[in-house]
Amino acid sequence: MLDKMNDELSKYKEDIEKSNYSVHELLTLASIVELEAGNASDRGDVAGVFNNRVKNNWTLGSDVTTYYALKIDDFTYSLTNTELATCNKYNTRSTCFNGLPIGPISNPGDESIKATVYPTDTKAYYFVADCGGKTYLSSTYNEHNNVINKLKRENNWCQ
């Protein structure tokens, strides 16, 4: 398994070395992108949003890290505010720390690794997916809430 991962990473070696991430950090972020992106084509966008949050020392704000931290396998389960605020080195929805969790939460595939090495250059800091998995990016929290409200009005909100 480690040999296969080394083979996968070798094609990105030079670009990983130029990035702001260690291999461990890159795999950690790619593991989150793997679970957060509604469609494979959206992975670069999701990685771009997370990259912006990390660069600006924000909390990563990824729900899938909360599910992982709390050992909840059902992503349709509605997390409570108490669960979202739980301090844990994996829970990036809490305000206990900013940036990446301490390690990967899944085994990222090549597409998620590639998206993390080459994230979309975006000004967005927020994203949400509709019921069909289409991802919508927003630059501000107000825009993000407007997208969510629109999806709810259209019965296309599946959170």
Identify the residue ranges that each predicted region occupies:
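Bacterial extracytoplasmic/cell-wall-associated proteins, especially those involved in peptidoglycan
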Residues: 1-159
